[in-house]
Amino acid sequence: CDWSSDVCSSDLILLLNATQITEEPEEGKPSTFGQCLALLGKPFILLSFLGIMCHVGIDVGTNTTAPKILMERLGMTLADAGFATSLYFIFRTAGCFLGAFILQKMAAKTFFAISVLCMLAAMFGLFVFQDQAMIYVCIALIGFGNSNVFPIIFSQAMLYMPDKKNEVSGLMIMGLFGGTIFPLAMGVASDAVGQSGAVAVMLVGVLYLMFYTWRIKK
């Protein structure tokens, strides 16, 4: 699917721009799949892995759900409602760009909390708003809020186990693809109660990220 490659590409580009990397000579053998999965036994690494899954779930979910919300509540055509996806990526891209500068001046934990609060407010807004402009504001907030979640979680995981950089990075990348399970749950929820059900699934992901905020080091 095109969206999966877009999600991975944008996150990896953001990571490379936002993270300072000191190259060191490679030592030992390349990490195996089993060695990466074994790190899930470490509580913080598991929390980080789940956090990245939530990030991807929110990202993919917003792209698929936002246009449907406009169509369901405002009777817009698919062509017109498709602007919601573009709006999301505009603010996500802007957030990626600004985040690289903000993280130089602000603690990662503080910025992560602000980002999650933006998404939390937006999710509640998507439950209640029927106005086109306000729905667009919510979509923009999700785009900005979700733009720096991946690099912050990734860096926190790397700092937690600096001696296992290869394994940790491999596991976090796996989380990008693991997050694709969210659309399945969202599809079931939307079939049952409409697009508000899909928003509820994304809200669970945002609430988890709120919980993860307290585990981030300053």
Predicted regions and their residues:
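Juxtamembrane intracellular "pre-TM" segments in multi-pass secondary transporters
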Residues: T22-S48
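Extracytoplasmic gate region of multi-pass secondary transporters
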Residues: A38-S86, T93-C96
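Structural signature of the two symmetry-related core transmembrane helices
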Residues: T110-G125
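Short, small-residue-biased leader/transition segments that mark boundaries at the very start
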Residues: C1-W3, V7-S9
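Helix-to-loop junctions at the C-terminal end of transmembrane segments
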Residues: G95-A108, S190-D191
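Intracellular juxtamembrane helix-capping segments at the cytosolic ends
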Residues: S147-P162
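Multi-pass alpha-helical transporter architecture, strongest
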Residues: L12-A18, L203-K218
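A late C-terminal transmembrane helix in Major Facilitator Superfamily
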Residues: Y160-Q195
